[in-house]
Regions:
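Short alpha-helix in the alpha/beta-hydrolase fold that links the catalytic acid
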Residues: 340, 354-364
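Acidic catalytic loop of the alpha/beta-hydrolase fold
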Residues: 348-353
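Alpha/beta-hydrolase active-site loop
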Residues: 140-165
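Cleavable N-terminal signal peptides of Sec/SRP-targeted secreted and luminal proteins
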Residues: 2-19
Length: 406
């Protein structure tokens, strides 16, 4: 499968009429080094002077997951009782929360604000690509999961581990994109986990998707049926793995000051929305060193199903639904069972998370939806919550102020 680095060429062809203005961003406050692209998450955190721990947990169905912890800030030695768990989006990893540097990475910012920061990794990404009995390279059974299993099994397993280690009974949860989807799955099918959440913050929330505007995602959704059949026939189960080949392509196309770097930027824009003023081109080599982190084909197909159905429901197995669910169609997630306080942060220019879908989500969450906040930048896109130059100002400050209420 092609990564966003290769999709860049296609994205350029279909989106060349909307190219962003060329910017060198030499005065960008986000500081990065190209060597960061090759460092592991613990190596990155250590390099910038923060404490770090790496934990492994095993799920009930045998997946071995990695969690990274920043127990306190750079200038502190005290571990706080304020625990926060960060969950990444599709094709991502715990690296998302730190690769923009100490002044812009949410993981670092929260640690310096006095939080005990834990960053999860879902099954199938390169940090959680392990199992007690299955080999991801040879056993297709390893990849038979979507974001349903991530929300139903992975996230509660990681949260239980975090609470056990810290001795706390509840924590804050912050998710981006799929990290919000998996939270809604967890708290709707395991309502007992609502009591373990002080508050949840959805950055670019995704549940309902029938109004999303990403042209490439619409193309994928339209062809999802034939593509799914083809993937099964030729044995493709893993989507956009993180490996040496992908890293090499990223080095070639996305290097800082490289003439092809604009292809990478426009690939991201074509999927998530155009936001040239927020894109720090200097972090692209680091970003493409850590992303894509890998996922299952079924994770992507589950989102394609959401786009086509307009519903927020479990994975559609087609004719096998009757055996799986006892009905011809998958059951919807019962959002009315979610009681944890939820704050939704969304933006005009997010092609993946449409405003009308976020409003519908808030309505269906009922009293659990404490508030929804429109980002005060009309160009803010789906990835800017993580990598945008003004993400701390527009998003993180709001989240931290809201956390203080709970």
């Amino acid at each position: 499968m092609l990564s966003i680095k290769l999709v860049a060429i296609f994205a350029f062809l279909v989106c060349s009429s909307a190219l962003p203005h060329e910017r060198t961003l030499q005065n960008n406050p986000v500081l990065t080094a190209d060597e960061d692209a090759d460092l592991t998450v613990p190596e990155l955190i250590t390099k910038y002077g923060y404490p770090v721990e790496e934990h492994q947990v095993t799920t009930s169905d045998g997946y071995i997951l990695t969690i990274h912890r920043i127990p306190h800030g750079k200038d502190s030695t005290t571990v706080s009782d304020k625990v926060v768990f960060l969950q990444h989006g599709l094709l991502s990893s715990s690296a998302d929360w730190i690769i923009t540097g100490t002044t812009h990475g949410l993981g670092y910012i929260l640690a310096d604000e006095g939080y005990d920061v834990w960053m999860g990794n879902a099954r199938g990404n390169h940090m959680s690509r392990n199992h007690t009995t299955l080999d991801p390279d040879n056993d297709s059974e390893f990849w038979q999961f979507s974001w349903h299993e991530i929300g139903a099994i992975d996230v509660p397993t990681m949260i239980d581990h975090v609470l056990e280690v810290t001795g706390q009974t509840s924590l804050y949860h912050i998710g981006h994109s799929q990290g919000t989807t998996s939270f809604y799955v967890m708290t709707s099918i395991h309502p007992e986990y609502n009591a373990k959440i002080k508050a949840h913050f959805s950055l670019a929330p995704i549940a309902y998707m029938n109004h999303m505007t990403s042209p490439l995602m619409h193309i994928l959704a339209f062809w999802s049926g034939p593509l799914d059949v083809l993937a099964k026939l030729i044995g493709i189960n893993e989507f956009l793995p993180n490996n040496e080949f992908m890293a090499m392509v990223g080095d070639v196309l996305c290097a800082d000051d490289d003439i092809t770097q604009f292809l990478c930027t426009n690939a991201l824009f074509a999927i998530c929305g155009f936001s040239p003023d927020e894109m720090n081109a200097t972090i692209l080599p680091v970003l493409t060193g850590h992303t894509p982190a890998g996922s299952s084909v079924n994770q992507v197909m589950h989102y394609a199903q959401e786009i086509n159905s307009g519903a927020f429901r479990q994975f559609d197995y087609g004719l096998a639904n009757l055996d799986k669910y006892g009905s011809l169609t998958p059951p919807p997630y019962q959002l009315d069972l979610i009681t944890a306080p939820i704050y939704l942060l969304y933006s005009h220019n997010d092609w993946m998370s449409a405003e009308v879908d976020v409003v519908k989500l808030c309505e269906n969450l009922g009293d659990a939806c404490q508030a929804k906040f429109l980002i005060a930048d009309g160009e803010f896109n789906h990835l800017d919550y993580l990598f945008g130059i003004r993400a701390p100002e527009l998003v993180y400050n709001k989240v931290i102020s809201l956390m203080a209420r709970h």
